A protein has these predicted regions:
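Beta-strand/loop-alpha-helix module characteristic of Rossmann-like adenine-cofactor folds
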Residues: 3-7, 75, 103, 113-165
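Class I S-adenosyl-L-methionine
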Residues: 1-104, 110, 115
Length: 165
């Protein structure tokens, strides 16, 4: 079976990775990802083939990973935190429609919001909101509306990407 794992590495490398993430990386022949994330784990998986690229090359990286999987190599697309929270899972799934023979497996990771809350001794209880301040894909007025709504709801708010355009 042609398989692409989309793996959340957690908040900073091997210490924050789940056992499932480590297992997916061990099973993979190819690891694809942003250069800085690959550098975090390269020492632990030196025998793997690495396909890396720089920031803003997300679509290109997804295609590289999907092509490697399509060629029959079990592949892992790595991202920081959780693959589904501002990670690569959504983009991979949308592009995977062009690769119907490739099974995409999402491997959850620990988000920066949850890790940060734990380190601060401030558990996120009784509901919380996670909001990205990046206006690259979301208009600024929509972000501001979300912030006002979360504040009005008296939620603890975890903010991602504090700088943008």
């Amino acid at each position: 079976m042609k398989r692409l794992f989309v793996v959340g590495l957690g908040p900073g490398g091997r210490d924050g990775m789940t056992l499932e993430a480590k297992k997916a990386l061990e099973q993979s022949e190819v690891i694809c990802g942003y250069t800085a994330y690959a550098d975090l784990i390269r020492e632990d998986y030196p025998e793997k083939e690495y396909l890396v690229s720089g920031m803003t090359k997300e679509v290109e990286r997804c295609h590289m990973a999907l092509l490697a999987a399509q060629d029959g190599k079990t592949t892992a697309m790595i991202c920081s935190g959780d693959a589904g929270v501002y990670g690569m899972a959504g983009l991979v799934l949308s592009l995977a429609e062009k690769y119907p023979e490739t099974e995409v497996v999402i491997v959850a990771g620990v988000t920066a919001a949850l890790s940060g809350a734990a380190r601060l001794g401030a558990p996120l209880m009784n509901d919380f909101a996670v909001i990205s301040l990046s206006d690259l894909l979301t208009p600024k007025d929509v972000i501001e509306k979300r912030l006002r709504a979360a504040a009005a709801g008296d939620f603890s708010i975890c903010l991602y990407t504090p700088s943008s355009k």
